[in-house]
Amino acid sequence: MSRSLSKGPYIAAHLLKKLNNVDIQKPDVVIKTWSRSSTILPNMVGATIAVYNGKQHVPVYISDQMVGHKLGEFSPTRTFRSHIKSDKKAKR
C-alpha cells in the first residue's frame, strides 16, 4: 500500500537538513545516513549518499530514474552465498 498523496513523501528531517547545508553537486561530498526509509526527491539527483545496510555504509549515486523510490532499495542487506557445485554428500 502506497503513502497517501495528501501527506507527501517521507524524508527524515536530519537528512533533509544535511542536503540543504551541503553542495551535493560536488563529487567528493558523500552524505552518510541510516535512514533507509526516506524517499528520493528530485532535488537529491546528482548527490552521493552512503546508506547504512546494517554492516557498512554503501555509497549510492542518485540518478533521475531513482526518484520516488526509497534509499534502502539500493543498499542490499543480505549477501548471497552460492550453493556448492560438487557436494558428494548431497547426491546420495
UniProtKB/Swiss-Prot annotation:
Keywords: Chloroplast, Plastid, Ribonucleoprotein, Ribosomal protein, RNA-binding, rRNA-binding. One of its GO terms (biological process) is ribosomal small subunit assembly. It comes from the Eukaryota. It is found in: Plastid, Chloroplast. It holds the Pfam family Ribosomal_S19. One of its GO terms (cellular component) is chloroplast. GO terms for molecular function: rRNA binding; structural constituent of ribosome. The keyword Ion transport does not apply. InterPro entries: Ribosomal_uS19, Ribosomal_uS19_bac-type, Ribosomal_uS19_CS, Ribosomal_uS19_SF. Transmembrane segments: none annotated. The keyword Cytoplasm does not apply. Belongs to the universal ribosomal protein uS19 family. Protein S19 forms a complex with S13 that binds strongly to the 16S ribosomal RNA. This is Small ribosomal subunit protein uS19c. The gene is rps19.
